[in-house]
Design a protein with these regions (language model features):
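Non-catalytic interaction/Regulatory regions outside core domains
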Residues: 1-88
């Protein structure tokens, strides 16, 4: 899956919200860890049972999930959102 168009940080989170089930919170960070959009509480979160992180050289997206999240699909959605962020 790919967005094939540029996304703003807020746009990336909105796009993810339309695709992914049971995402409780999300944030987009820049390479330095500054929150560009979303929940600032996720800035220091690491990968765990209910937290997924996807990174590129320029951005990171962190999501906190609930028990119904389809994590394999969410991982693909996160990669596509990162692609859209990195196009911008």
């Amino acid at each position: 899956m790919t967005t094939r168009s540029a996304l703003t940080p807020a746009g990336a989170l909105g796009w993810l919200a339309t695709l992914s089930i049971d995402v409780r919170a999300a944030a987009v960070l820049d390479a330095a860890g500054t929150v560009l959009a979303g929940d600032p509480a996720l800035a220091g979160a690491g990968e765990g049972p209910d937290v997924m992180v996807a990174r590129s050289e320029r951005h990171a997206i962190v999501v906190r999930t609930g028990p119904r999240a389809l994590k394999h699909l969410l991982r693909a959605d996160l990669r596509a959102a990162l692609e859209g962020l990195d196009i911008a």
